[in-house]
Amino acid sequence: MNIGEAVKLRILELCKMRKITVNKLATISGVTQSTLSNITGGRNNSTTISTIKKLCDGLDISIEEFFCSELFRHLEQEIK
């Protein structure tokens, strides 16, 4: 799995845990719905830390909590 896929799955997982929609997350985090739709739709594999920080703020979690998931433990090497 690459980092983009892991970020996408983590966002969807956190929305499910919080019982909110992706659109609601966009609203509460100040990220545009199109940006979040691109991430969760797999059309953006290079999400910035700044965007992830905004999402974390909207979810009231730290960046550390965001990345504290099995999804990020065994990522593919990006540079070969």
Which residues does each PLM region occupy?
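Residues within the helices of the helix-turn-helix
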Residues: 12, 23, 53
